[in-house]
Amino acid sequence: MSRFFANGSDSESESSEEEVPTQFNNKAQNFQFSDDEEEVKRVVRSTKEKRYENLTSIIKTIRNHKKIKDIPNTLSSFEDLTRAYTKALPVISKEENGITPRFYIRCLAELEDFINEVWEDREGRKNLSKNNSKSLGTLRQKVRKYIKDFEDDLARFREAPDQESDVDEGEGDVHDSDADRAGDDSDTGFGVGAKMAELPKAAKSSVQPTKIIADDDDSEDSIDWDPDTESETESSEDENMYQNMRERFLKRTTEKEDKDDDKRKDKRKEQKHKVRKRADDDEDGEGWETVVKGNVVEKPKMFEKDAEIDVPLVLAKLIEIMSARGKKRTDRRLQIDLLFELRDISEQHSLGTAVAIKIHFSIISAIFDYNLKISEPMKLEHWALLLEVMQSMMKLLLANPDINMNESIAEEHEEYATAPFYVRGCPLAAVERLDDEFTKLLKECDPHSNDYVSRLKDEVNVVKTIELVVQYFELSGSNNERCRIYLRKIEHLYYKFDPEVLKRKRGEQQPATGAAGATPAAPVQSSVEVMDKLCKFIYAKDDTDRIRTRAILAHIYHHAMHDNWFQARDLVLMSHLQDNIDAADPSTRILYNRMMANLGLCAFRQENIKDAHHCLVDLMVTGKPKELLAQGLLPQRQHERSAEQEKIEKQRQMPFHMHINLELLECVYLVSAMLLEIPYIAAHEFDARRRMISKTFYQQLRSSERQSLVGPPESMREHVVAAAKAMRCGNWQACANFIVNKKMNTKVWDLFYESERVREMLVKFIKEESLRTYLFTYSNVYTSISIPSLSQMYELPLPKVHSIISKMIINEELMASLDDPSETVVMHRSEPSRLQALAMQFVDKVTNLVDVNEKVFDMKQGNFFQRGNMGNRDRGYNRNQNNQGGNWGGQRRDNRSQRNRNQRGHHKQNQQQNQQQQQQQVHTIDEE
């Protein structure tokens, strides 16, 4: 027995003796109660309930993540949701007849709205962390791809969305069975709580007094006693409540569920009451006003209640509002609202058009000032507002020619009372900034989304605004201002293709004129004519080189796009742009690269293969045409540039709708190189000093030849290389099939206007160059060749074959003569045979080897005394030594004579050695 029990009192021992049987009885009762299998309640859940419970729990998790904007966890939960729904599909198709549950559609709709809300909040999106931003993009793509299968269900749901009370009720219905099971399940930790909820109030009240009566000294005993009492009470209550076995398994409602039902009913009543009240208020004509959280800030009053509104008062108020521009605590949104209110007040009091124009220009400036960062695009609501105000101001200026608006007018010289009116401002600067903002909006959008198409539709309004400014400056404007606005119009016109120009050129369509019997209307100007007019004015009136250079480049681009090859080529040659373009700014150099690319495509369409190759070679040989054309940055070079440089280069990028197809450019370049390089290789097969026409094409060809096993071509480059190999053998049909086929048509040739004509031109050139290659390759085999057989072999007209062979003979490419009576080509055999060509190559290599050996021998033996200085280095050394002696002159003469004797001896030895080497080399050559 331990010390603790030994030192105890009698009362404690008595109490312990009394407590022992009680504890034993309780243990026995507890043991019998827990082991009683009749009391264990087992619940069998259907597969539908399990799957739906899994879906609803994940949906709740997603809602919690959305509330705190935890996007990475939202993404992972969404992936879990899709997997859970895939598992539940068999149950849905069986139980629900394939109809998607409404709570699942509601979750998808809420998730889509959440993503759109976060995505449209540009300022908030910039403040996201890197992980959140990356997860947002991934989540957006996955959700947009996933909900395509539920578009009809989502459309029906959005037509009649659930109210908040319906949402709660729907979720409650889904969990009804779960709540019942939670109350009955004794294996989980919720069994006791559910039973306590089912107990009547009398049972609870019988437990509570025992806790209150207990003394402080016996608190531990009371704590130990209470749970046993509760368990006994529960067991007795269960026995009394479930006298019938059937009642034990019937579904029953707890008091908690009854309270929840009452709450739902109260919510519905309140909502119906609110709807009725809102309808009554609408009938009374009283509108609703949204209460903003926080302190209500009253909008400052414009004028005093009894103030007389006139021009000086409005202008003073305008100066007061605009004086807050650029200050730190200025509310820029409020500033715009105040200016609009001031405009309405001036219109109500008819203060004149000049004041209205001044206020319009101030609104435009305030909208531009709203965005503090110049590199970022403005909000869409401000963009639409800017377009509207800008067009309204220009219409007022055009309707009132007595109003002069110029930035050179000082504020003290402004006139608003009497005509002519003078207003300080520069509409040209405003429209230039408007155009720049439009470009930034396009660059910000995803080029493959509907947002880009929507923004691109605004170009119509931008061009209309520019046209209004052009009309205004044509009436009153300097030459410099007209050149600037003309350049803006040119930059929106030069890259657009007008098919009517080509139809007129071919005579398929006559210029539009008036109807018969009516006065003849002025013919509609084509885009080429408009470009000619604008560019010629700039050529004559511009004082700055930049505007003129950009106008020339745009003019050449437009000519090349409409197949005016000779006009475009003459403009390039006469302007000498290629000599001065290195000194231009980066945007002008980008325009020059775009012009050269389009000029090469034009030359290719006009069958000038050599010119097309010359135009494209500078772009393609660098290996980075994407960067040179400002159509994107190469990822492998990003470590070579700083963040600031990368930001600047991104600002210079061209909008997506102005891009030139890079695969089309590369294909045209490689095909042009093939048509030039393959005949040249065949003509100079044994020339050791053969030059390369196209380095890029030559590398592609060599890399393909190094491969041991070459499969069928898949990419565009592989098609061109396979065609080159076929042409090298003179097989024009295989070459044409590799260049012109279904895959290549889809990738490349269908991108051309009148693509069928381009394909016919390609096949014709392939036939001609294959014929030339065949004659170069096999001329040493034939004694004579029949021209009709060549014509039949290459499916070319007889005069065309005759012309090709005649050109080859005239240019001394083919050593042959034409026999007209027999229509044959007689070979002269002046070219060396293959064995002779190899022997000549061998002789050249041996000669080079001999030269190298002689140089190496001279370096080893030395030829110092054969130089012209004749040992002047030693002369200075001897002079220094002799200065120390007395007989300086005698020693000098003796040294000189000795040196001459030594030189003569060395010279004779070198001559003898050289003669012996030459004799040995002659013997070795004879032996070989």
Curated annotation (Swiss-Prot):
UniProt entry keywords in alphabetical sequence: Cytoplasm, Initiation factor, Phosphoprotein, Protein biosynthesis
Positions with biased composition (Low complexity): 910-921
Modified residues (Phosphoserine): S34, S165, S177, S186
InterPro entries referenced in this protein's UniProt entry, alphabetically: EIF3C, EIF3C_N_dom, PCI_dom, WH_DNA-bd_sf
Domain PCI as annotated: residue spans: 656-832
Record-level Gene Ontology MF annotations: RNA binding; translation initiation factor activity; translation initiation factor binding
Compartments where found: Cytoplasm
Basic residues compositional bias, start-end: 265-277, 898-909
Entry annotated with the keyword Mitochondrion: no
Compositional bias segments (type: Basic and acidic residues): 172-184, 245-264
GO cellular component: eukaryotic 43S preinitiation complex; eukaryotic 48S preinitiation complex; eukaryotic translation initiation factor 3 complex
Region Disordered, annotated ranges: 1-37, 157-286, 864-928
A Pfam family: eIF-3c_N
Ranges of biased composition (kind: Polar residues): 22-33
Source organism superkingdom: Eukaryota
Acidic residues composition bias: residue spans: 11-20, 162-171, 215-240
GO biological process, one term: formation of cytoplasmic translation initiation complex
Quaternary structure (record): Component of the eukaryotic translation initiation factor 3 (eIF-3) complex. The eIF-3 complex interacts with pix.
Functional description taken from the UniProt entry: Component of the eukaryotic translation initiation factor 3 (eIF-3) complex, which is involved in protein synthesis of a specialized repertoire of mRNAs and, together with other initiation factors, stimulates binding of mRNA and methionyl-tRNAi to the 40S ribosome. The eIF-3 complex specifically targets and initiates translation of a subset of mRNAs involved in cell proliferation.
PANTHER family according to UniProt: EUKARYOTIC TRANSLATION INITATION FACTOR 3, SUBUNIT 8 EIF3S8 -RELATED, EUKARYOTIC TRANSLATION INITIATION FACTOR 3 SUBUNIT C-RELATED
Family statement: Belongs to the eIF-3 subunit C family.
Protein name: Eukaryotic translation initiation factor 3 subunit C
Organism, scientific name: Drosophila grimshawi (Hawaiian fruit fly)
